[in-house]
């Protein structure tokens, strides 16, 4: 990155339309393809080495300099001479270049904000570790939780208009709009088969992206979520807790921060609705992937108001059609909230904590809520069935995709899945469901080996013996755990206790 810093500083000197020249710079595509222009898509095209890849980029830049080739006919865009026979390759290269150039102002803004706040740069900002202290410390004291599915905008034009409020570069966004329309005509980026989140199993998210160009569209999607979250948090902090104060939602982003300084009742012309809700100092907001969690200690009446407020905010500000089922409010003690990509559920159960002030005094029992991790067998089995490790009924089957690998690699891949599950669900008190999943993986591994060697499952069971069985069901005892030791004989039964999420801290380091 240091070798390109000089070029970036020169291009940043033009504050007006400073992004547009970056699209014609070779080093932008070098940054996109890991400094070598030989990764991602270019690797899949046989016969292209580093030099020829650089020639492809130069040829693409030369075509972009010829402005007449960038004009697309409104009647028939398929005859556009700009792309030629290599339209898929050129479009993929250009999408990576656009992704890098658009991300530059936001990355520079993040670095400057970290420097002003004297915060050390962290590469683990998207870590899941911050979720677990939230559930451990805050979640048991809340009454209601709302599991929210963040909808996706109806059209990509909405994302471009949102970006224009942050970056004043008309030329770049005209080219970006032209590029997206060309992509939509080919149907090569947006396909009805791949979702934006591979872990999401909700059918309410209409956003689908192809595997070949995820970086650019994931940036647009994450920016839309960030924009929605910023408006939501701003309205939450500025709402009134006294009486039923009403105000208009600041849907448009033009002069948004000027309106923050002089906060008054502002009504949008297209959406003159008035929202009524309270400022809740006890509400907690956690966003992960395409979903978010709203947890509060308020009454169900206020939670319903927040629910309809979110739906109205999506429909008016983000121009997304969100159904009422997208935000479901439930009592935290009665229902579990599924979160993250590991299909983990948590439930708040009552627990008795015994305490003793003096050695021979009475033992006091305090009732408090504790968090139990549940291993959901049905979602995990569905995930394994999607990965072709078992059928829909949970019966193990062979995985033919891995049959071409060596025996060591096949066994190691299945064992790695078991280690991941053990590390994640190690704190669960009931591990019967985990053992069932491991049993499915073990038989799937053996059937894959038998398929590779054209033999029977019984033969491989005799050949491998009990060693493979022990490896699949061995607990990860070497993982770090926090143990509380007490010398008092009265509390002998409470000597050991595991804080389960610390195991994941160690596993992901």
Curated annotation (Swiss-Prot):
It is found in: Plastid, Chloroplast. Pfam families: Intron_maturas2, MatK_N. GO terms for biological process: mRNA processing; RNA splicing; tRNA processing. It comes from the Eukaryota. GO terms for molecular function: RNA binding. Keywords: Chloroplast, mRNA processing, Plastid, RNA-binding, tRNA processing. One of its GO terms (cellular component) is chloroplast. HAMAP family: MatK. Usually encoded in the trnK tRNA gene intron. Probably assists in splicing its own and other chloroplast group II introns. Belongs to the intron maturase 2 family. MatK subfamily. This is Maturase K. It comes from Vachellia farnesiana. The gene is matK.
